[in-house]
Amino acid sequence: AMTVAPFLRHGPEGAALPLVLDSPHSGEHYPDDFDHVPPRAMVRRAEDTHVARLYRGATRVGATLIEATFPRAYIDANRSLVDLDPSMLADDWPDAVTPSRKTEQGIGLVWRIARGGTPLYNRKLSAAEVQRRIDRWYLPYHAALATEIDTLHRAFGAVWHINCHSM
């Protein structure tokens, strides 16, 4: 199977500006282990579809765009790592969790429900599989974003970061 990178980096065309855009919710690659129960079309309603495409034009004026490739319902790059619902897990999570209102609504770090309230899973997730999602998708995305911001900050002394969404 083809290995999909956790993010796409769209670099500036021409001279760089200290401007980083990221699109954490436009990912359309559904990993093989995302065994959601509702139909794909329903799960896809969580996506900020086409947001990354809308902002790609910013690279023409010197911005850098980091785009998530994975779906937010699988692992949400715009949530804190502690924003986890322990009731979704079959076993204990090794770290402290601080579920937010988003998690209470079923849309935390790992989504419990699809848009409209349909449960995503007919099983509990293992702590190990959630950790794999974090390691394989979430952390590399955030590392790429941090690298971009740090590099431009060093070069320019300041940097602007715009987190891009469809609402």
Q: Model segments located where?
A:
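A glycine-rich, aromatic-flanked flexible loop/lid motif
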Residues: 163-167
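N-terminal catalytic or cofactor-binding beta/alpha core of small enzyme domains
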Residues: 2-161
